[in-house]
Protein backbone atom coordinates (compact mmCIF):
# COMPACT_ATOMS: atom_id res chain seq x y z
CA UNK A 1 0.00 0.00 0.00
CA UNK A 2 1.57 3.26 -1.14
CA UNK A 3 0.54 6.24 0.99
CA UNK A 4 0.91 9.80 -0.28
CA UNK A 5 0.86 13.05 1.66
CA UNK A 6 -0.45 16.27 0.12
CA UNK A 7 0.04 19.72 1.65
CA UNK A 8 -0.72 23.17 0.28
CA UNK A 9 2.01 25.70 -0.41
CA UNK A 10 1.27 27.57 2.83
CA UNK A 11 2.90 24.64 4.65
CA UNK A 12 6.41 25.62 5.72
CA UNK A 13 8.88 22.78 5.32
CA UNK A 14 12.42 22.76 3.91
CA UNK A 15 12.41 22.10 0.17
CA UNK A 16 14.88 19.22 0.43
CA UNK A 17 12.79 17.61 3.17
CA UNK A 18 9.72 17.79 0.95
CA UNK A 19 11.61 16.31 -2.00
CA UNK A 20 13.13 13.52 0.08
CA UNK A 21 9.73 12.40 1.34
CA UNK A 22 7.92 12.84 -1.99
CA UNK A 23 5.45 15.39 -0.66
CA UNK A 24 2.91 16.64 -3.19
CA UNK A 25 2.44 20.41 -2.99
CA UNK A 26 -1.02 21.79 -3.72
CA UNK A 27 -0.38 25.22 -5.28
CA UNK A 28 -1.93 28.47 -4.10
CA UNK A 29 -2.68 31.47 -6.32
CA UNK A 30 -1.25 34.83 -5.25
CA UNK A 31 -2.73 38.04 -6.67
CA UNK A 32 -0.42 41.04 -6.28
CA UNK A 33 -1.40 44.42 -7.69
CA UNK A 34 -3.77 42.65 -10.05
CA UNK A 35 -1.15 40.21 -11.37
CA UNK A 36 -1.60 36.48 -10.76
CA UNK A 37 1.22 34.18 -9.61
CA UNK A 38 1.16 30.46 -8.82
CA UNK A 39 3.07 29.47 -5.67
CA UNK A 40 4.36 25.92 -6.07
CA UNK A 41 6.94 26.12 -3.27
CA UNK A 42 9.93 26.23 -5.61
CA UNK A 43 12.77 27.74 -3.51
CA UNK A 44 14.50 29.51 -6.40
CA UNK A 45 11.32 31.16 -7.65
CA UNK A 46 10.29 32.01 -4.10
CA UNK A 47 13.63 33.74 -3.47
CA UNK A 48 13.31 35.69 -6.72
CA UNK A 49 9.77 36.61 -5.73
CA UNK A 50 10.84 38.08 -2.40
CA UNK A 51 13.82 39.89 -3.92
CA UNK A 52 11.52 41.52 -6.49
CA UNK A 53 9.97 43.59 -3.71
CA UNK A 54 6.42 42.62 -4.62
CA UNK A 55 5.65 41.63 -1.03
CA UNK A 56 6.85 44.88 0.49
CA UNK A 57 4.50 47.48 1.92
CA UNK A 58 2.63 49.47 -0.69
CA UNK A 59 1.67 46.41 -2.74
CA UNK A 60 -1.79 44.86 -2.47
CA UNK A 61 -1.31 41.11 -2.05
CA UNK A 62 -3.93 38.42 -1.53
CA UNK A 63 -3.90 34.64 -1.82
CA UNK A 64 -6.63 32.56 -3.40
CA UNK A 65 -7.26 28.85 -3.00
CA UNK A 66 -7.23 26.65 -6.08
CA UNK A 67 -10.80 25.97 -7.21
CA UNK A 68 -12.58 22.66 -6.74
CA UNK A 69 -12.07 21.85 -10.43
CA UNK A 70 -8.36 22.70 -10.36
CA UNK A 71 -7.79 20.52 -7.31
CA UNK A 72 -9.88 17.69 -8.80
CA UNK A 73 -7.73 17.67 -11.94
CA UNK A 74 -4.51 17.61 -9.90
CA UNK A 75 -5.76 14.76 -7.73
CA UNK A 76 -6.82 12.71 -10.75
CA UNK A 77 -3.57 13.27 -12.62
CA UNK A 78 -0.97 13.18 -9.83
CA UNK A 79 -2.47 11.34 -6.84
CA UNK A 80 -4.89 8.65 -8.04
CA UNK A 81 -2.31 7.38 -10.53
CA UNK A 82 0.54 7.11 -8.00
CA UNK A 83 -0.89 6.24 -4.58
CA UNK A 84 -3.31 3.77 -3.00
CA UNK A 85 -4.09 5.98 -0.01
CA UNK A 86 -3.74 9.76 0.15
CA UNK A 87 -3.94 12.27 2.98
CA UNK A 88 -4.38 15.94 2.13
CA UNK A 89 -3.58 18.37 4.95
CA UNK A 90 -4.73 21.94 4.40
CA UNK A 91 -4.07 25.26 6.07
CA UNK A 92 -6.71 25.95 8.74
CA UNK A 93 -10.18 26.22 7.25
CA UNK A 94 -10.80 29.41 9.23
CA UNK A 95 -8.28 31.27 7.02
CA UNK A 96 -8.76 29.73 3.58
CA UNK A 97 -11.17 27.95 1.24
CA UNK A 98 -8.58 25.27 0.45
CA UNK A 99 -10.09 22.75 2.87
CA UNK A 100 -13.60 23.23 1.49
CA UNK A 101 -12.48 23.07 -2.15
CA UNK A 102 -10.21 20.07 -1.57
CA UNK A 103 -13.00 18.20 0.22
CA UNK A 104 -15.39 18.74 -2.68
CA UNK A 105 -12.69 17.69 -5.14
CA UNK A 106 -11.96 14.56 -3.09
CA UNK A 107 -15.61 13.50 -3.12
CA UNK A 108 -15.72 13.85 -6.89
CA UNK A 109 -12.45 11.96 -7.31
CA UNK A 110 -13.57 9.05 -5.11
CA UNK A 111 -16.66 8.64 -7.28
CA UNK A 112 -14.79 8.70 -10.59
CA UNK A 113 -11.21 7.50 -10.17
CA UNK A 114 -11.43 4.00 -11.69
CA UNK A 115 -10.61 4.86 -15.32
CA UNK A 116 -7.66 7.08 -14.46
CA UNK A 117 -6.27 4.46 -12.10
CA UNK A 118 -6.69 1.64 -14.61
CA UNK A 119 -5.01 3.70 -17.33
CA UNK A 120 -2.02 4.18 -15.03
CA UNK A 121 -1.81 0.42 -14.44
CA UNK A 122 -2.58 0.56 -10.73
CA UNK A 123 -4.69 -2.23 -9.24
CA UNK A 124 -7.04 -2.08 -6.27
CA UNK A 125 -9.12 0.65 -4.74
CA UNK A 126 -8.08 4.19 -3.92
CA UNK A 127 -8.97 6.00 -0.70
CA UNK A 128 -8.37 9.55 0.42
CA UNK A 129 -8.93 11.89 3.35
CA UNK A 130 -8.79 15.70 3.52
CA UNK A 131 -7.80 16.93 6.98
CA UNK A 132 -8.04 20.46 8.38
CA UNK A 133 -4.61 20.97 9.95
CA UNK A 134 -6.02 23.78 12.15
CA UNK A 135 -2.59 25.34 11.62
CA UNK A 136 -0.75 27.94 9.58
CA UNK A 137 2.82 27.98 8.30
CA UNK A 138 5.20 26.35 10.82
CA UNK A 139 2.37 24.56 12.62
CA UNK A 140 1.24 22.99 9.38
CA UNK A 141 4.82 21.95 8.65
CA UNK A 142 5.06 20.21 12.01
CA UNK A 143 1.88 18.25 11.32
CA UNK A 144 3.22 17.15 7.93
CA UNK A 145 6.53 16.01 9.40
CA UNK A 146 4.73 14.06 12.12
CA UNK A 147 2.41 12.50 9.52
CA UNK A 148 5.41 11.29 7.51
CA UNK A 149 6.76 9.68 10.67
CA UNK A 150 3.44 7.86 11.15
CA UNK A 151 3.37 6.77 7.50
CA UNK A 152 6.84 5.32 8.02
CA UNK A 153 5.43 3.20 10.83
CA UNK A 154 3.05 1.60 8.29
CA UNK A 155 -0.08 2.12 10.35
CA UNK A 156 -3.40 0.87 8.92
CA UNK A 157 -5.14 3.69 7.06
CA UNK A 158 -7.89 4.21 9.66
CA UNK A 159 -5.37 4.30 12.50
CA UNK A 160 -3.20 6.70 10.50
CA UNK A 161 -6.10 9.06 9.93
CA UNK A 162 -7.06 8.94 13.62
CA UNK A 163 -3.50 9.68 14.80
CA UNK A 164 -3.11 12.59 12.39
CA UNK A 165 -6.45 14.16 13.32
CA UNK A 166 -5.72 13.76 17.04
CA UNK A 167 -2.32 15.43 16.65
CA UNK A 168 -3.85 18.57 15.12
CA UNK A 169 -5.14 19.52 18.58
CA UNK A 170 -1.73 19.10 20.22
CA UNK A 171 0.28 21.67 18.26
CA UNK A 172 1.23 24.97 19.88
CA UNK A 173 2.77 27.89 18.04
CA UNK A 174 4.80 30.97 18.97
CA UNK A 175 4.75 33.98 16.63
CA UNK A 176 6.99 37.05 16.75
CA UNK A 177 5.52 39.76 14.49
CA UNK A 178 7.91 42.53 13.46
CA UNK A 179 5.19 44.97 12.39
CA UNK A 180 1.82 44.74 14.15
CA UNK A 181 0.31 47.50 12.01
CA UNK A 182 1.09 45.67 8.76
CA UNK A 183 -0.22 42.37 10.16
CA UNK A 184 -3.39 44.14 11.35
CA UNK A 185 -4.07 45.58 7.89
CA UNK A 186 -3.54 42.20 6.21
CA UNK A 187 -5.78 40.50 8.78
CA UNK A 188 -8.55 43.10 8.39
CA UNK A 189 -8.83 42.26 4.69
CA UNK A 190 -9.71 38.71 5.74
CA UNK A 191 -12.22 39.93 8.32
CA UNK A 192 -9.90 39.22 11.28
CA UNK A 193 -10.17 42.03 13.86
CA UNK A 194 -8.11 40.41 16.62
CA UNK A 195 -5.47 43.21 16.55
CA UNK A 196 -6.87 46.63 17.46
CA UNK A 197 -5.66 49.90 15.93
CA UNK A 198 -4.52 51.13 19.36
CA UNK A 199 -2.43 48.02 20.01
CA UNK A 200 -0.84 48.23 16.57
CA UNK A 201 -0.08 51.95 16.97
CA UNK A 202 1.43 51.57 20.43
CA UNK A 203 3.49 48.60 19.32
CA UNK A 204 5.03 50.61 16.50
CA UNK A 205 5.42 53.87 18.46
CA UNK A 206 7.04 52.24 21.48
CA UNK A 207 9.04 49.69 19.47
CA UNK A 208 7.36 46.83 21.33
CA UNK A 209 7.72 43.33 19.90
CA UNK A 210 5.15 40.93 21.34
CA UNK A 211 5.35 37.17 21.56
CA UNK A 212 2.08 35.53 20.56
CA UNK A 213 1.42 32.00 21.78
CA UNK A 214 -1.48 29.66 21.30
CA UNK A 215 -2.92 26.39 20.12
CA UNK A 216 -3.05 26.02 16.37
CA UNK A 217 -3.86 29.25 14.52
CA UNK A 218 -5.35 30.95 17.60
CA UNK A 219 -3.05 32.93 19.85
CA UNK A 220 -2.76 35.67 22.44
CA UNK A 221 0.16 37.91 23.48
CA UNK A 222 2.07 36.29 26.34
CA UNK A 223 5.11 38.58 26.48
CA UNK A 224 6.12 42.08 25.37
CA UNK A 225 9.75 42.84 24.62
CA UNK A 226 11.62 45.99 23.63
CA UNK A 227 13.13 44.53 20.46
CA UNK A 228 12.96 41.63 18.05
CA UNK A 229 16.18 39.91 19.19
CA UNK A 230 15.00 39.70 22.81
CA UNK A 231 11.70 38.19 21.65
CA UNK A 232 13.55 35.59 19.57
CA UNK A 233 15.75 34.68 22.53
CA UNK A 234 12.69 34.18 24.74
CA UNK A 235 11.03 31.89 22.21
CA UNK A 236 14.19 29.88 21.55
CA UNK A 237 14.74 29.36 25.27
CA UNK A 238 11.14 28.21 25.65
CA UNK A 239 11.45 25.83 22.69
CA UNK A 240 14.67 24.35 24.07
CA UNK A 241 13.00 23.79 27.44
CA UNK A 242 10.08 21.98 25.79
CA UNK A 243 12.49 19.76 23.87
CA UNK A 244 14.27 18.90 27.13
CA UNK A 245 10.91 18.13 28.76
CA UNK A 246 9.98 15.75 25.94
CA UNK A 247 7.83 16.22 22.86
CA UNK A 248 5.19 14.06 21.20
CA UNK A 249 7.15 14.11 17.94
CA UNK A 250 10.89 14.43 17.18
CA UNK A 251 10.41 17.69 15.27
CA UNK A 252 10.34 21.42 15.88
CA UNK A 253 9.19 23.57 12.95
CA UNK A 254 10.55 27.09 12.46
CA UNK A 255 9.54 29.70 9.87
CA UNK A 256 11.56 32.89 9.41
CA UNK A 257 10.62 35.95 7.41
CA UNK A 258 14.29 36.85 7.18
CA UNK A 259 17.09 36.85 4.64
CA UNK A 260 19.88 34.30 5.01
CA UNK A 261 22.21 37.14 6.06
CA UNK A 262 19.88 38.11 8.90
CA UNK A 263 19.51 34.49 10.00
CA UNK A 264 23.27 33.91 10.08
Question: Language-model segments: which ranges?
Answer:
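Short, conserved catalytic or adaptor-binding loops enriched in Gly and charged residues
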Residues: 17, 116-124
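N-terminal glycine-rich anion-binding loop in soluble enzyme alpha/beta folds
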Residues: 4-77
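Short Gly/Thr/Asp-enriched flexible loops that form oxyanion-binding sites at enzyme active sites
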Residues: 90-118
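Anionic group-transfer/hydrolysis microenvironments
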Residues: 10, 92, 134
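Short, charged beta->alpha transition segments
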Residues: 68-80, 115-118, 239-240
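Mixed-charge interfacial surface used for oligomerization/domain docking
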Residues: 14, 18, 23-24, 96, ...
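Hydrophobic residues at beta-strand termini and immediately following loops
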Residues: 26-28, 89, 131
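Structural motif
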Residues: 4, 85-87
Amino acid sequence: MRVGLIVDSACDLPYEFSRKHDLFILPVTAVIDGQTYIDEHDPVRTQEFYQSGLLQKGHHAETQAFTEDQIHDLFMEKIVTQFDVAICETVTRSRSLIFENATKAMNSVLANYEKARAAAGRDGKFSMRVIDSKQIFAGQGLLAAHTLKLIGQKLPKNALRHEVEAFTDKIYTCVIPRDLHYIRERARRRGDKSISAVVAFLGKALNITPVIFGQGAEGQPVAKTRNFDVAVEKVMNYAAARVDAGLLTPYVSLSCGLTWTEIE
